[in-house]
Amino acid sequence: PFTVANFVTLAEGKNNYVSPNYKGIHYYDGLTFHRVESNPPMIQGGDPTATGQGGPGYKFKDEFHPELNHGKAGILSMANSGPNTNGSQFFITTDQTSYLDGKHSVFGEVVDGIDIASTVVVGDKINKVKIVRIGQAAKKFDAVKVFKEYFEKQAELQKVLEGVKAKKVALFQDIKTNGTKSKSGLIYKITKPGTGKKPNAGQNVFVHYAGFLEDGTLFDTSYASVAEENGVLDLARKQANGYAPFPFSYGKKTGLIAGFIEGLENMKFGDKAMLIIPGYLGYGEQGTGPIPPNA
């Protein structure tokens, strides 16, 4: 419902979370379709800058439902730049695009005029978006209230997440103080011993992991539960069974960062360990993705 509330409040000029220059205006009126594609087949609009980079001044999370999919032409769905980065940009499919399921939030459908959508070209203008409420459920739907409640809930969740991060930081400090420091500078601690047997060199093992920055920010994990606890669960990845341990040839010296490999070499089957990996044993000065330089 909050995805619909987003669109409705923007269209009616009642969205209280937009940047000041968009306050009180009918956001979509006069904007253009800045992107028209054949693969994926769709027309995209909702960007006041017409560059594909613009938005309302906020982002909100994905909202999926198994009955809402991209299985045909005329589906209205949110454009994004990755998980939980929805704003104001939307697209309308001009053919089935089922491979977008679990990646983009469906919130509407063209019931009349899909033939017009197929003739749209880049630069065509959206003259006006008018919200017409048909039926009691639609008339009772308070878009302003629904969107407000979404952000209030997100604020509460953020407080919880800050608490989770604070506990992680305290745990990391404890490991730094009480863990074992190797000659390389890696600090590690076996937090839960396993079977006591060490893998043979070349033996294939499966490794679960959760990677955090020093401030407690989770940057990646093989555990869906850890991702959810830290507020970064990727539903598409979960649906694709992407949260799983990865295979690794024990004793191999390549394929992972040096600190991770060294940590694994200090572990046995079933062990759980905490590793404090200095930047020079990680991604170094260049960093990578969400991991900054020297982290």
Segment roles from a protein language model:
Residues 1-295:
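Cross-family detector of peptidyl-prolyl cis-trans isomerase
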